[in-house]
A protein has these predicted regions:
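Gly/Thr-rich phosphate-binding loop signature of adenosyl cofactor/nucleotide-binding cores
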Residues: 2-88
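Structural motif
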Residues: 55-58, 93-96, 116-117, 157-159
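Charged, amphipathic alpha-helical linker segments immediately N-terminal to NTP-binding catalytic cores
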Residues: 91-96, 100-137
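Residue-level recognition of alpha-helix initiation/capping sites
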Residues: 100-102, 142, 166
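Glycine/proline-rich, flexible active-site/cofactor-binding loop segments
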Residues: 136, 143, 160-161
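Pre-Walker A adenine-sensing motif
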Residues: 139-151
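Glycine-rich phosphate-binding P-loop
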Residues: 155-170
């Protein structure tokens, strides 16, 4: 069975230069295991079938405008469902607001209650998504370790493999 890899949210925040709006949430213990991200537009509209909450949730201009139009009470209700988790879905590792969008204080309090980090970036949504997906694909890529020596024999590369300590380099 293939080994699965993870990356800490703390490392992602540092690498992507994200602002942690919920400073009281311990991001060092949160691990990201999926390379995909999700824009929760359908979830904000109340549709939670097939919701992959294990992904980083990204709020862009479209989602933010929708939340503003629906009002704060409705937004808090939907975001609580997203953040609280249930028997059908887990809590997301984090929610990222792009384009330096405004985050209401009540939403920050809700995120703190459920220990879901709210992060913010100045980057445009599509640019941020492309960057984070590329970075996660590298960090979470499958790996293979072998004991071996590479040689150049008459211009051809040769890999000699074997157990450690059997004299491959002799």
């Amino acid at each position: 069975m293939a080994e699965t890899y993870s990356v800490s949210l703390e490392k992602l925040i540092e690498q992507m230069e994200l602002e942690n709006v919920t400073g009281d949430v311990d991001v060092s213990r949160i691990e990201i295991v999926q390379t995909d991200v999700n824009r929760p537009a359908l979830q904000l509209a109340g549709f939670f079938d097939y919701f992959d909450s294990g992904r980083i949730q990204i709020i862009g201009h479209v989602e933010h405008t929708y939340m503003e139009q629906k009002g704060l009470d409705y937004t808090l209700e939907m975001m609580e469902i997203i953040m609280a988790g249930s028997e059908r879905h887990t809590k997301p590792p984090c929610i990222v607001f792009c384009r330096d969008l405004y985050i209401d204080e009540k939403l920050i309090q809700l995120a703190s209650k459920y220990q879901v980090p709210l992060l913010r970036t100045k980057k445009e949504t599509n640019a941020f998504m492309a960057e984070v997906i590329r970075w996660l694909n590298v960090e979470l890529a499958p790996r293979c370790s072998v004991h071996g020596v590479l040689l150049d024999l008459f211009g051809e590369g040769v890999l000699i493999m074997g157990e450690s300590g059997i004299g491959k380099s002799e």
